[in-house]
Regions:
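Long amphipathic alpha-helical segments with strong coiled-coil/leucine-zipper propensity
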Residues: 80-166
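General structural signal for secondary-structure boundaries
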Residues: 21-24, 77, 205-206, 238-243
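Extended, charge-biased low-complexity segments
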Residues: 57-86, 94
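Long, intrinsically disordered, low-complexity Ser/Thr/Pro-rich regulatory/activation regions
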Residues: 229-251
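Short N-terminal micro-motifs specific to bacterial/archaeal maturation
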Residues: 122-125, 192, 200, 234
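An amphipathic, hydrophobic-aromatic interaction surface with interspersed Lys/Arg
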Residues: 1-62, 66, 70, 130-225
């Protein structure tokens, strides 16, 4: 499903806390630090369980705790995460690991504890999961379901091992196949004749790229089937599906 706001580059409201802006192609391709933030902002509880499955730890951190751990332990990570929030929110934040809270709208240098902590806009453990899903949405990814609470640790570890096996199989299949890299996708869009060129394609939202490719493929399949019918193909075997439909939708 294509989100029209993200397609046109408009932000999504995250409750009454902040707006989350869809990054552009330039944002993603020209900023290695943001790639790190993307992984950190989107990591799921299941992925953390998979990472810690063979480690003897008393408790596996939540995605929010994992973010704070990275910020607290590494100054470079702290700078990168602040940069990532600025790019997504278009406003500064202050991260306070000791209080387990992210204050929106003020940088560390600007924050006045006497004035800005009365009714602050914050991201914390209570709303971080929902914030992550908004981030996933502006990046063109699918939101995830909340993790199962109070699940038996043995069941969690068993599920983690199954996912590890599935990833290994997927990697083997990927090596045999020929995946299309992002550069090839944006080059293909520049050849569609819709006004996008290497000079301006960096201005569209990052999430648009697979959507434009998908719509183009649907249109191409429809055109091929129509031409085949005009050339005398068997109508029972060639049944054009109209291309203006939601991506992956069967009609």
């Amino acid at each position: 499903m294509i989100n029209e706001k993200i397609f046109l580059g408009f932000p999504l409201d995250f409750k009454d806390v902040c707006k989350v802006y869809p990054p552009t192609v330039n944002d993603m391709c020209g900023d290695e630090e943001f790639e790190y933030c993307q992984t950190l902002f989107m990591i799921t509880q299941e992925e953390l369980e998979d990472a810690y499955v063979n480690e003897n730890v008393p408790a596996i951190p939540t995605p929010f705790q994992y973010l704070l751990m990275n910020v607290h332990q590494d100054d470079v990570a702290r700078v990168n995460v602040l940069h990532g929030f600025q790019k997504l929110l278009h406003e500064p934040v202050t991260i306070v690991p000791e209080l387990e809270v992210i204050i929106i709208g003020k940088s560390e240098e600007e924050l006045d504890p006497d004035k800005d902590l009365e009714n602050p806009r914050v991201i914390d453990a209570n709303n971080y999961f929902d914030f992550q899903n908004v981030v996933r949405t502006v990046l063109g990814a699918q939101p995830v379901e909340p993790p199962v609470e109070d699940e038996d640790p043995r069941i969690r570890r068993y599920k983690a091992k199954i996912r590890a096996s599935e990833r290994m199989i997927a990697r083997k299949k990927q090596k045999k196949g020929s995946g299309t890299n992002f550069g090839t996708l944006i080059a293909a869009i520049c050849c569609m004749g819709i006004g996008l060129t290497p000079l301006n394609i960096g201005e569209i939202s990052y999430a648009c790229v697979p959507w434009l490719i998908g719509m183009s493929q649907q249109k191409e399949e429809y055109d091929i089937d129509i031409r085949a019918l005009l050339a005398g193909a068997d109508k029972k075997k060639v049944k054009p599906k109209y291309w203006i439909k939601d991506l992956n939708e069967e009609i």
